[in-house]
Amino acid sequence: MVAAAPSNKERLPDMMTSIRLDQSGRVEIIDQLLLPHSVVWMPVSTPEEAFDAIKTMRIRGAPAIASLAALTLRSYLSSSSSPVSSSSSSSDVISWVGQTIDYLQSSRPTAVNLGEAMDRIRAALKDSEAQNQTAGDIIQRVKKICGDVHDEDLERNMKMGRLGAEWLWKKRGGGKKGLKVMTVCNTGSLATSGYGTAIGVITALFQEDHLDTAYYAQTTPYHQGSRLTSLELTTLQIPACMICDTMLGSLFQHEDIDGVIVGADRVVKNGDTANKIGTYQAAVLAQRHNVPFMVVAPVTTIDLSLPTGAEIHIEHRPAAEATQVRGLDTETGKLSVVRITPEGVGEGDKPWQRVYNPSFDVTPAELISAVVTEKGVAERKEGEKSIDVASIC
């Protein structure tokens, strides 16, 4: 009797991870600036080092940077280098932790997950002060929250992956062996604590044998797609195809795309979504071709305090990130950075030297078919221009 071939679920290789703890509990991250050509783990021991890693995008992805900030704070509070300890006064602990989380939050203002994690700590500090807790108790409480921020992410990502895959298969799976989907940026294990958001849905489709091909955009100028998503999908051996950002229209014209699946850095009350630059254009094309457009993000990414996307602060990145590119020299085998524009572009103040380099764009809710969180799926109703994301918080 011939044994049945293993399913995709059974043969899925181990996923990558962006954050780990060494034997002493010290935080380490993969330097994502060196990926995919070199995997280098770098220690992050202080809040200043965490701030720098987030600001320089050595780690990126809204859930991942929240985890890094939280885990680094926990590790630092346990170290001999910490300026506060159980022997400090409660007021000193509250003051130092408060200043530190403000500092960490300023490293990436668009990503709401980081702010949500820091707000959890702020609320705990306020409550601890009201209860007159000891310095030691306050420190332990903060450390517990920091650990929870990281641990909760993986579980909810797997829930979102399942919910999103089920929703899209129900919408487009009839009579098909597998779906063709498209994604932007990097939303997998390198951007989260594990499994991923949008890539989590793609992985779930693959595990259920419901995936034909996952197309992913290069996502210039930082190449999160060509550098990071490509690495994750090839590691997982998921059928995938890279496309240049300028090829999205051609892809929709010539392939029967079943869905666009993206992550988010912030989803506001009406469903407007801030995500990596290039998401909006994918949404416009998806609507033109009647393709479902799905946003996948944890509840921590939803910001009900902002009514519309017009209020979202959009971070602009240095011009050098658009005028230069980092890669592997195929002749020398060494990593190098090369300029791809004429000298002076992005470096001077002349009208002909300017570079427009926003890190995010905002996709209006009227272009989004559904928002998926770990709590459920909120669909945009026919003819409506908003989505009731509060129902899945």
Curated annotation (Swiss-Prot):
Q: What's the Enzyme Commission number for this chain? A: 5.3.1.23
Q: Does the keyword Isomerase apply?
A: yes
Which SUPFAM superfamilies does the entry mention? NagB/RpiA/CoA transferase-like
Q: Which GO terms describe its biological process?
A: L-methionine salvage from methylthioadenosine
Spell out the residues of the site Transition state stabilizer: C185
Cellular component annotations (GO), alphabetically ordered: cytoplasm; nucleus
Q: In which pathway does it act?
A: Amino-acid biosynthesis; L-methionine biosynthesis via salvage pathway; L-methionine from S-methyl-5-thio-alpha-D-ribose 1-phosphate: step 1/6
Q: Which UniProt keywords apply?
A: Amino-acid biosynthesis, Cytoplasm, Isomerase, Methionine biosynthesis, Nucleus
Q: Main location per UniProt?
A: cytoplasm
- Annotated active site residues, numbered on this chain, are D265 (proton donor)
Top EC class, one word: isomerase
Q: Which family does it belong to?
A: Belongs to the eIF-2B alpha/beta/delta subunits family. MtnA subfamily.
Q: What does this protein do?
A: Catalyzes the interconversion of methylthioribose-1-phosphate (MTR-1-P) into methylthioribulose-1-phosphate (MTRu-1-P).
> Know the name of this protein?
Methylthioribose-1-phosphate isomerase
Q: Tell me the lineage of the source organism.
A: Eukaryota, Fungi, Dikarya, Basidiomycota, Agaricomycotina
